[in-house]
């Protein structure tokens, strides 16, 4: 009667082929967007949109007279959040 560890080892052998698939899934061409004859990476547009949204958020927070602690960390986190959301939504 197989033990729990031997059953787990058999399952791992059955699914071991998946690991190389995930390792090479990022080896495709990078998404580039042509703008006036030049190709720019899509992360560049996500960063620009994220910067604009972060500045808008900063303006809203300033107009609401909200004082934030750790401003640098908060705006950096907002920038990263917006960039990842744009990447997820559009690419």
Swiss-Prot record:
Listed transmembrane segments: 33-53, 70-90
Protein name as catalogued: Uncharacterized protein YtcA
Matches recorded under InterPro entries: YtcA
Membrane topology of the entry: Lipid-anchor; Multi-pass membrane protein
Alphabetized Pfam families for the sequence: Ytca (PF17090)
GO cellular component, one term: plasma membrane
UniProt KW keywords: Cell membrane, Lipoprotein, Membrane, Palmitate, Signal, Transmembrane, Transmembrane helix
Compartments in which it is found: Cell membrane; Membrane
Lipidation (N-palmitoyl cysteine): 27
Lipid anchor positions (S-diacylglycerol cysteine): 27
Main subcellular location: membrane
Annotated source species: Escherichia coli (strain K12)
């Amino acid at each position: 009667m197989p033990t729990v560890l031997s059953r787990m080892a058999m399952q791992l052998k059955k699914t071991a082929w998946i690991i190389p698939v995930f390792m090479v899934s990022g080896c495709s061409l990078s998404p580039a967007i042509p703008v006036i004859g030049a190709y720019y990476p899509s992360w560049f547009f996500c960063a620009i949109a994220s910067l604009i949204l972060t500045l808008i958020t900063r303006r809203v927070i300033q107009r609401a007279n909200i004082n934030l602690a750790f401003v640098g960390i908060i705006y950096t986190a907002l920038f990263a959040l917006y960039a990842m959301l744009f990447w997820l939504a559009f690419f």
